[in-house]
A protein has these predicted regions:
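Intrinsically disordered, low-complexity, charge-rich terminal extensions
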Residues: 1-177
Length: 177
């Protein structure tokens, strides 16, 4: 049995590959996302993306911030071998919108902004508002879980090396913004 720290360090690349793949899917095949969540209206990269390039015993970190940030610098980093290590996402379903950040190394979700829950006018409304807020968090978490399950199925399939990786390389090399 692997020690937890050893397993963490050994497999943390999967989260980074997941986020890199997710960026590719968001840009190139948003219809694929709808097959995973039919109620999905859109999934977009939010106001922050972090990439890391681990080369020659060094670490280069590229952070792109801002609501209108251009992602060309991030794609250039991908061309040089970087992977996405953190990504802010905007998930829209129906008339509701969630914003949150995923860290690749742990798949930790943070900075949650959920749709507004119902207003609390009486003490009896409080329990319902708490349950509704928990439900709203759970919807986004389940969506990310489904995305990751789909990624893992692809990652261990023969399609990963023969089809997906070449498509990602083609996208990175042809990216125009």
């Amino acid at each position: 049995m692997l020690d937890v720290a050893v397993a963490y360090n050994r497999f943390k690349f999967l989260g980074d590959e997941f986020l890199t793949w997710l960026w590719f899917i968001i840009e190139n095949d948003p219809g694929h996302l709808k097959t995973l969540s039919p109620e999905l209206l859109s999934l977009e990269i939010g106001n922050r993306i972090v990439l890391e390039n681990r080369r020659h015993q060094g670490l280069e970190r590229i952070t792109i911030n801002g609501d209108d940030a251009k992602l060309e610098e991030g794609v250039l980093a991908l061309r040089k071998g970087a992977v996405v290590t953190e990504m802010n996402l905007c998930f829209k379903s129906g008339d509701q919108e969630w914003r949150f950040t995923i860290k690749g190394e742990s798949l930790n979700l943070s900075g949650f902004k959920t749709p507004l829950a119902g207003s609390v006018e009486t003490a009896e409304d409080l329990e319902g508002a708490v349950i509704e807020k928990a439900f709203l968090y759970d919807q986004a978490i389940q969506f990310v879980d489904n995305l990751f399950k789909n990624f893992i199925k692809l990652r261990i399939s023969n399609q990963w090396q023969s089809k997906i990786v070449p498509q990602i390389r083609k996208w990175v090399n042809a990216y125009a913004g």
